[in-house]
Amino acid sequence: MDNYLKAALSVEQLKVSYVQNKKRLPVLDGISFVLEKGKILALLGESGSGKSTCGKSLIGVLPPSAKIDSGTVRFGNGDYVDISDNDINWKTIRGMRIGMIYQDAQLALNPVKTIRVHFEETLRNKPFPSKEAMEKVCYDMLRLLNFDDPERVLNAYPFELSG
């Protein structure tokens, strides 16, 4: 793909399989796409076609039964990310430069945890120098989403927020 330099995200030949009863079951067989900066991309397909597997692969949250067989992912200005589980770049990218919105957002949030806890769980693997620095990122993210009172939102439970 020669468009990757102007892309926000470039995925090349991503192959993912699941292991079930000691058998390898391919789910993604060489998916490739480019998402240009400022554009929106939607993955459409029937149930079981690999949409969620693709998204989970990109943010590194596949279940233990899944394996990324091969592929490359480039973020932003052509930064190469080895999509193996051991790549340290995942920690600096996941949750900060890429994320996933679940089909049913109500199921994605634990109702007994505050929004602050959800943020902290997402950011816990990031190299923050202090808890205050991590909190600043939480506040900044909420301000980007046009929340006027980030402190109130962080202390709220999912059911206390509307929309």
Regions found by a protein language model. Name each.
Residues 155-161:
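Conserved ABC ATPase signature
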Residues 1-21:
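ABC-family P-loop ATPase nucleotide-binding domain
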